[in-house]
Amino acid sequence: MTEFRIVEAVALSPEETWRRVTDWPRHGEAVPFTVVTGDGRTVVGRTGIGRFGFADVMDVERWEPPQGSFGVGRCRLVKRGPVVTGWAEIEVRPYRGGSAVRWREELRIGVLPGLFDRPTAWCGRVVFRRALRTLLRG
């Protein structure tokens, strides 16, 4: 497994930042070739073209939206495969009149040996930083 972290600061309230970052269907607009659905307990990101692709199935293990302008919001998703396993943690907190998002993720692409952990982390940082910035732009 490989872990990566992303931190972004924005001039949005913690509540608005949380709303944008946890709007699961919008993640599909930010990640190429992906459609995301969710029912509040499970989030599924289907990535692919036509019949070729895979589903990243995630269970919402922790859901604590920020309460008020000074609250901290936390969400933990557990990826249960079959192709992608691991977890993602999202934290939103007040920061300099706006808010900061910390996205931490540990993942494993099932078919890849550990030799690919570093390139996977690099790709994860690039893809998720781009996705996070897109989500925060609204």
Tell what function each PLM region has.
Residues 106-138:
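A conserved amphipathic terminal alpha-helix motif
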Residues 43-45:
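Ser/Thr-rich, low-complexity intrinsically disordered terminal regions
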